[in-house]
Each structure stands twice: as C-alpha cells, then as structure tokens.
From Swiss-Prot:
The gene is GOLGA8K. Residues 352-362 have a biased composition (Basic and acidic residues). This is Golgin subfamily A member 8K. Pfam families: GM130_C, GOLGA2L5. GO terms for cellular component: cis-Golgi network; Golgi cis cisterna; Golgi cisterna membrane. Keywords: Coiled coil. PANTHER family: GOLGIN SUBFAMILY A MEMBER 8H-RELATED, GOLGIN SUBFAMILY A MEMBER-RELATED.
Length: 630
C-alpha cells in the first residue's frame, strides 16, 4: 500500500512538471521567422549583437551609399527583437531553474514523506500483527473461559441436585427422628408405668429380686471369665497357628525354589539333548552319505570286513543313542505335560474358590444393619447386655471370615438373651439380619502363580481363612455348651423348692405355697407363678410364630380363638396371660410381620425348633411376677 501511494504521488508530480513546462515553454514570434526566411544570412550577422565592424560599414557605406541606412534600420529591428527574446528567455530560464529547485525540494519533501509513511506503515503492520496475536490469544482465552463456564454450570447443576437430594434426605431423617422420638416417648411412658407398678411391690420381693440378680451377676461374671479364658486360648491357638503357617510358608517357598530349579535343569537338559540329537543326526547323515556314495572306478585298496563291521556297529550305536534320546525327550515332554495339567487343575480350583468367595462377598454386602431398640435396660439385665456386647466384640475380633457361623452364633445369643430378658417388655432385642448365607470375603487369587512371593502369600491367606473358620466353629461349640449349662442350671433352680414346681405348673401354686410357711412358701408360690407365666409365654410365642407363618386374617392351626384368650385372662391372678394374648394380637395386627425385621424370628424358629418349646424358665422373669397374695 505504501509503495502504491508513493508511485501515485510520483506520477502526479511528473504530470504537474510536464504541465508546467508546457505552460512556461518560450514561443518564437512569427516576425522573427519571417526575417530569417527573407534575409537569409542576416540573422547570423545579428548574432554579434547587431553591430558591424567599422571596416565593413565603411565599405558598405562607400559602396552602397543611401541604401545602407535603410538596411541598418531594417537590421536593427530584428536585433532588438532578438535581444528582447533573449532577455525573456533568460528570465524564463531563471524562472525554470527556480522551479526546478523548488521541484527538487518538493521531491525531497515527498521522498521524506514517503519514507516517513513507510516507517509509519511498518509500525502499523507490526502493531497490526501484535494486535492479531493478541486477538488470537484473547479468542483462545475466551474459548477456555467458555469451557470453564460450561463446567462450572454443570458442577453447579450437580451441586444443586445434590443439595436437593440432601434436603429430601434431611426431611426424611427429620421425619424419622420425630417418629423415633414418639416411639421413645411411648417407651419411656411404658417404662414409667412399669416402674410405678414395680414400686408398688413389696420390699421383700425387691430384696429377693436383688439377691437373684446378684446370683445371676456372679454367674455371668464366671461366664465372662470363662469367655475371656477361651478368648485368650483362642489367641494362643491363633499365635501357634500363625507360627505353623510361617513354617508352612517357608516350606512352600523352599518347594517352589526346588521346582523352579528343577524346571531350569530340565530346560537345560532338554537343550543339551536337542543339541546331541542334532549332532547325531548330522553324523548319521554323513555316514549315510558316505555309504551312498559310489565306489571309485579304481579303488586303491578294498576296505576290509573288519572296517565295515566297525562302521555298522558305529551306525547301530548312533541309531540307538538317537532312539534313546528321542525316548528321553518324550518322557520329558510327558512330565512337562503332566505338570502343566496339574497347574491348570490348581488354577481351576483357585478360580472356583474365587468365584465362590465373590458370591459370598456379594451376599455379605446385602446384609442389613441391626434394628436399633430404644429401651433402656433395667438393673437386672445390664449384665446380660454386657455379655452380649463382649460376645459381639469377640466376633468382631475374629473377623467376618465366616459370617454364616457368626450369624448363627449371634442368633443363638440373642435367643438366649431374649429368654433371659423380661417377657413383659414385648419386643426384646433382636438383630435385623436379612438373611441368607453370609459369605467370607474373597481373597484375591494372584494371576502370576509362578512368582514365589504371590504363591506363598496366597497359600498363607487361605490357611489363615481356614484357621479362622475353625476358631469360629470352636467358639460356636463353646456357646452351645454354655447354653446347655444355662438350661440345666435353670432346671436345677426350679427343682430346688422341694418338688413343688410340677404341681405349681399344673395350677396349684397358690395352695401348695399356702401349705408351707414363711419364706419357703412364698418362694414356692413365686416359682409356681413363674412356671405358669412362662408356660403361657411359651404358648404366646408359639401363637406369634403361627401368626407369622399364616396371613394376618387367617388364624393359625394351633392358635386359640379370642374367646379362649379372654377366658385365659380371667383365670387366676396372672397378668402374664394378658401380655401373651396382647402379644398375639399385635402379632396378628402388626404389619411389621411382612417386613424383613420379623422374618429372622420365623427363620430362627424353623432352624431351631427347640427354642420355642423349651420349658426352662429364665431367672429374670421372676422379677416380673406379681406378689403372691396370702
């Protein structure tokens, strides 16, 4: 652009210069041209200023006479005209020189302006390039900002949705909190009522209950010490087994090293045998070629039979070595094949075990959390709850390697504690286990079985799992034994008051107690009342299970009619019958039986049918018996 403007300016300056020259160019007058044509050589003479030398003028004057003056006049006029023309031309030349100087100055100015314009254009181009680069960077920054804005909008939407979800959850939790608070208030009200009822009992009954609770506390302490001793024994066995596993691990590592060394030696022997076979094949081919070559026409000497026999023996020996080597290679290949088959079988077993443990891990994740119970324990069953807590801690320490056995143990403990708890509380504590088999977590099977460390760690892990499962089984056996001992002790305590328990169970508790005197009669009557109440409690438990098996509208096959329940309420002075009937009514009307929390009770009754029909009376239920009226 700058060059084009410069060329245009130069062209305009040239045009102006041409116009100026055309305007100021000198024009010769027409009279002067005529004088040049008519006079011939007269203008040449006039070049000397129109003056002739005196010699010529004198000669002319003398020669021509009167005509010389006329010619002189005629010559003076063009000379004067030419002088005027020359003066005008000199003036024009000076003017032209001035104009040329002015034009040169203008040209210099124009060139200087062009250079300045070039510099300005270069600066503008540089600035333009810088601006283009800045525009590109701004566009890139704009795109980045747009992407950041898009991501920020997405994250904002995500956080808004999350906040909405959290608000909904908070609302549900608040609702649940209100429900739980209402349930807790109801429970507290029932507990207050029960406390008021218990406060109306006699002082002797409370003292007797305290004695019984102290006995139970002593028994539970003994059992707790036994559990601690068993736990210490289990820890010692675990340490011994860990040492045994370390020795087994070292032995397995040594065996793996030996196997790897044997494999390396077999590979080396195989390579050496292959080389020997190649050498023998080459020697055999050479011997065959030597035997196949035709005899020369004139042999220098016929080979003897001894040499031929020697060659045959050599050939047979080479063939025998070759066959032996082939057989050896076949045996090595068979050994390698068998070893590969064994490794594949081990991998298949490990894969099946991995799948089994993965299935168990999936079922473990489906377990539900235990249902929280909002009942404050009384002074009588605090020790039992502490025992349950210690058993849970022991179960957590043993781990979740065999959760099926641990769940059975927990169910048995909760059943025992529910038998030991007060039957009037209605609900009792139970775990909300959803169910099914609880698999042990799957150990990750190492893919690279050839690595010694992975194989040894995998075998160590499997043995630890087996050890833990055995420990859980031993703990279950111990708990079963403890449960049987508890039943025997309760039977023994029931049979202590002098053989009156049987008659009292049949309904004669009041009369038998009246026959005796003092505290013995009171204890016997309490035992009779406890047996009758517990029999009614067992009947109510069976009815509850029957109602759980059957629908809510249909009564169970062994469930009595409501009239029978009302009659049972009127029989005697026992309040526990009304509690069992109310428990049955709740079992029929309660919609929670359709929920998973009521299913483990029915499942426990199916798996252990002896729990509902056991006639042992827990000692804590005597604390709930009404005072016998004398």
């Amino acid at each position: 652009m700058a060059e084009e403007t410069q060329h245009n300016k130069l062209a305009a300056a040239k045009k102006k210069l041409k116009e100026y020259w055309q305007k100021n160019s000198p024009r010769v007058p027409a009279g002067a041209n005529r004088n040049r044509k008519t006079n011939g050589s007269i203008p040449e003479k006039a070049t000397s200023g129109g003056c002739q030398p005196p010699r010529d003028s004198a000669t002319g004057f003398h020669r021509e006479g009167p005509t010389s003056s006329a010619t002189l006049k005629d010559l003076e006029s063009p000379c004067q005209e030419r002088a005027v023309v020359l003066d005008s031309r000199s003036v024009e030349i000076s003017q032209l020189k001035n104009t040329i100087k002015s034009l040169k100055q203008q040209k210099k100015q124009v060139e200087h302006q062009l250079e300045e314009e070039k510099k300005a254009n270069n600066k503008k181009q540089k600035a333009k390039r810088v601006l283009e680069v800045q525009i590109q960077t701004l566009n890139i920054q704009k795109e980045e900002l747009n992407t950041d804005l898009y991501h920020m909008k997405r994250s904002l939407r995500y956080f808004e949705e999350k906040s909405k979800d959290l608000a909904v959850r908070l609302q549900h939790s608040l609702q649940r909190k209100g429900e739980l608070e209402s349930v807790l208030s109801n429970v507290m009200a029932t507990q207050k009522k029960k406390a008021n009822q218990l406060s109306s009992r006699s002082k002797a009954r409370t003292e007797w209950k305290l004695e019984q609770s102290m006995r139970e506390e002593a028994l539970l302490k003994v059992q707790l010490t036994q559990l601690k001793e068993s736990f210490q024994q289990v820890q010692l066995e675990r340490d011994e087994y860990s040492e045994h596993l370390k020795g087994e691990r070292a032995r397995w590592q040594q065996r793996m090293r030996k196997m790897s060394q044997e494999i390396c030696t077999l590979k080396k022997e195989k390579q050496q045998d292959m080389r020997r076979v190649e050498k023998l094949e080459r020697s055999l081919s050479k011997l065959k070629n030597q035997m196949a070559e035709p005899l020369p026409p004139e042999p220098p000497a016929v080979p003897s039979e001894v040499e031929l026999q020697h060659l045959r023996k050599e050939l047979e020996r080479v063939a025998g070595e070759l066959q032996a080597q082939v057989k050896k290679n076949q045996r090595i290949s068979l050994l390698n094949q068998r070893q590969e088959e064994r490794i594949q079988e081990q991998e298949e077993r490990l894969r099946k075990q991995e799948e089994r443990i993965q299935e168990q891990h999936k079922s473990l994740q489906q377990l539900a959390k235990p249902q929280s119970v909002f009942e404050e324990p009384n002074n009588e069953n605090k020790n039992a709850l502490q025992l349950e807590q210690q058993v849970k801690e022991l179960q957590e320490k043993l781990g979740e390697e065999h959760l099926e056995a641990a769940s059975q143990q927990n169910q048995q403990l909760t059943a025992q504690l529910s038998l030991m708890a007060l039957p009037g509380e209605g609900h009792g504590e139970h775990l909300d286990s959803e169910g099914e088999e609880a698999p042990q977590p799957m150990p990750s099977v190492p893919e690279d079985l050839e690595s010694r460390e992975a194989m040894s760690s995998f075998m160590d892990h499997l043995k630890e799992k087996a050890d833990l499962s055995e420990l859980v089984k031993k703990e279950l056996c111990f708990i079963h034994h403890w449960r049987d001992r508890r039943h025997q002790k309760t039977h023994h305590l029931l049979s202590e008051p002098g053989g009156c328990a049987k008659d009292a169970a049949l309904g004669g508790g009041h009369h038998q107690a009246g026959a005796q005197g003092g505290d013995e009669g009171e204890a016997a009557g309490a035992a009779a009342d406890g047996i009758a109440a517990y029999s009614n409690y067992n009947n109510g438990h069976r009815k509850f299970l029957a109602a759980a098996h059957n629908p809510a509208d249909e009564p169970g096959p062994g469930a009595p009619a409501p009239q029978e329940l009302g009659a049972a309420d009127k029989h005697g002075d026992l309040r526990e019958v009304s509690l069992t009937s109310s428990a049955q009514g709740e079992a029929r009307e309660d919609p929670l039986l359709d929920k998973p929390t009521a299913q483990p009770i029915v499942q426990d009754h199916k798996e252990h049918p002896g729990l509902g029909s056991n006639c042992c009376v827990p000692l804590f239920c005597w604390a709930w018996l009404p005072r016998r009226r004398r």
